[in-house]
């Protein structure tokens, strides 16, 4: 059975896992790391980089490096690179394509299906955008599940007995808290709350502002106005934050950060953990209200919670751990990896869908109330927040004026009493209502939320049976035409990436045979005939001339010609008793071993 990939598509880092032998296994990326930076970059030559490669070059290429795109999912934002604009879905798809390709290389099979996690507090449009990103990346997204729920799956897979747990999930860009009940293979979400604009990125920004403000006081230069300097500050801030989780102070050293008429300027300062905690105190405090709301909605007190589980890289910060301990009165559980448990949970859900994991039932909830605008601009809720999904609910409405023949259904998501203060999910018209006094027509509005948390709405005139229905798509949602275009471009990029990789591999082989040939000439050149030496030197030069070009076939032809001459000569020398560390005992050109047919079986790495 083909694997279904479980993906934690994070703000700062992403992770993937599958079920192997009935157990979830985290898949390392091509570079060997278990998490992949959610970073995309475009070089000035048009090459696309994703993950560690993109993050490494961010300092020298800040304007063409895209970070934290998850925060813009479900919005109208577009990222312009050269003459092309990219939607957040397309950038996220590039990250997903990298994960998909690395998983395929690791598993040795094609991946076509996935379960992707999202913050519990993601709106409908953000969930739709995530599903579209998967589609653009060539993945059928079987299920969208909430990150805290996935973490609970990872925690509760082998647990016996009944427990009420709180998942406190503070990641790079979002905060979620969920209250769940686990027992007898059932994982039921009782309540969820959160903040989609709060996370480790905000902590980094506080450090950046502190460093920049101190530098401004001393030198009168605002480093935030210099994009390269700002990117160096971002890197330094992230490193400092991580180091302060285990150290009481850290040194921030950035030589030649800028220059003025008096010469170059440097940063060399100490940031203590106490100062860092002072900088982020109010941000951490913002997590209090969602925690209290979730407890209230679940009708529980902190004392009734059996375990508090920390999820997300930002929960490694000691101040956050202490805050959670004081807030809940419990020592947080640290027995699961906060960076990997969400992907593991996604893989478990994938295993449930594939029938590989038995006896687990997941009951999730909708994070925000759903309803419509009614007379006077009032928001009338049809489905309350924290309702278990999938669900379907209906309510009867009527007309507001005499003779009204059509009604506009304005679909909203939120908790505020007035429609204007909530998020619009969509609008549609039900027409063809027979003229009648107001209050007479009976219009049934039905909300249907599927297991992905995606909303479907219908309105039906009970008098005529006339009905209109839509699957909600926000104004920022990509059209089908745009999705198809993005899919084609993604396939084109995948083809370009494949060709680029093949070109790099050809250059690597060329570099290896050049090294071995030059070594042979140094060690045994005096044992060759003049004709042999000239022939090898000629073909060596020909390969050097083309190896940095863009024509892979030309490079491979030059490699083949040089390899043939190399082996003709080295075989003759070997038979005469001369040795060199290519033909006898040592590695062959390309780092492999000679096969029985005399061809070279290469084994190399591409960096």
UniProtKB/Swiss-Prot annotation:
Q: What is the annotated role of this protein in its UniProt record?
A: Acts as a chaperone.
Q: Which GO terms describe its molecular function?
A: ATP binding; ATP-dependent protein folding chaperone; unfolded protein binding
Identification of the protein by name: Chaperone protein DnaK
Q: Using the record's annotations, give every residue carrying the modification Phosphothreonine.
A: 174
Give the source species.
Caldicellulosiruptor bescii (strain ATCC BAA-1888 / DSM 6725 / KCTC 15123 / Z-1320) (Anaerocellum thermophilum)
Checking Pfam families in the record gives: HSP70
Q: Which InterPro entries match?
A: ATPase_NBD, Chaperone_DnaK, Heat_shock_70_CS, HSP70_C_sf, HSP70_peptide-bd_sf, Hsp_70_fam
**Induction statement:** By stress conditions e.g. heat shock.
Gly residues biased stretches: 583-595
Q: Known Gene3D superfamilies for this protein? A: 1.20.1270.10, 3.30.420.40, Actin, Chain A, domain 4 (3.90.640.10), Substrate Binding Domain Of DNAk, Chain A, domain 1 (2.60.34.10)
Specify where the region named Disordered lies, as residue ranges.
Answer: 577-607
The Swiss-Prot or TrEMBL record describes its family as follows: Belongs to the heat shock protein 70 family.
Q: Which UniProt keywords apply?
A: ATP-binding, Chaperone, Nucleotide-binding, Phosphoprotein, Stress response
